[in-house]
Amino acid sequence: SVTDSSAAGTALATGAKTYNGAIGMDDNKSVLQSVAERAKKSGKKVGVTTSVSVDHATPAAFYAHQPDRGMYYEIALDLPKAGFDFYAGGGFLKPTTTADKKEAPSIFPIFEEAGYTVARGLDEYKSKSAQADKMILIQKEGAEPSCLPYAIDRQEGDLTLAEITESAISFLTKGSNKGFFLMVEG
């Protein structure tokens, strides 16, 4: 069978082959440590950024450990467990619905309780980032969470991957000289 992006993302992030659908797990559903997790353990700041949703297969493979890529809510719950410093993308696909289609508490207060500052749009990021220890940057309220708009469809104030990347580098280099790891998917 042809490799899907969750298996490919897991291979990129961990160096291990796995089954289609797996996020950060091997064929036996055991957790695989990603290069991003190793960087964090070594004292580096870590960021995961994407032009799609933050809980999508490739970015998730760097911070999450779930047996199925469709477990968007559960993948999002793995984000604060990883404890990385910066996450950014279009948004989150299922912020209040579990994989078994049950209503659940919104992920955003969970992120905030874990010490993350959530910024919706670049202007909000600029006003909040200086005081933030950990940051999540997503599209403005009401924007499509699945991906950033293509250039031809972009409106004033829409995030771009270039803005996300610049913001990530700026955030990850403030107050630290231990280096950083940044995954950018576009």
What are these regions (language model features)?
Residues 1-129, 133-134:
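N-terminal catalytic scaffold of extracellular/periplasmic and nuclease hydrolases
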Residues 123-186:
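Anion-binding catalytic surfaces of enzymes that hydrolyze or transfer phosphate/sulfate esters
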